[in-house]
A protein has these predicted regions:
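C-terminal alpha-helical interaction appendages
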Residues: 1-64
Length: 64
């Protein structure tokens, strides 16, 4: 997964007005208590980040 796809998915599921705020403020235990933005900055693969987001948002399996 590319970073652009990660941001597209976040926008789709969280909305245009909220996805960037959520990505910079919500800490994920699956990412070592990092936010999406911090995890990206630390070089965590987008696929791993998306799995953490998918679980946190309790999205359906089809969106994994």
């Amino acid at each position: 997964m590319k970073e652009t796809e990660l941001w597209q998915r976040l926008r789709l599921h969280l909305g245009a007005d909220y996805f960037r705020v959520w990505a910079s403020e919500y800490s994920h235990s699956a990412l070592g208590q990092r936010t999406v933005v911090e995890a990206l900055s630390d070089g965590v693969p987008c696929k791993i980040i998306w799995r953490a987001v998918w679980a946190a948002l309790e999205l359906p399996a089809r969106d994994r």
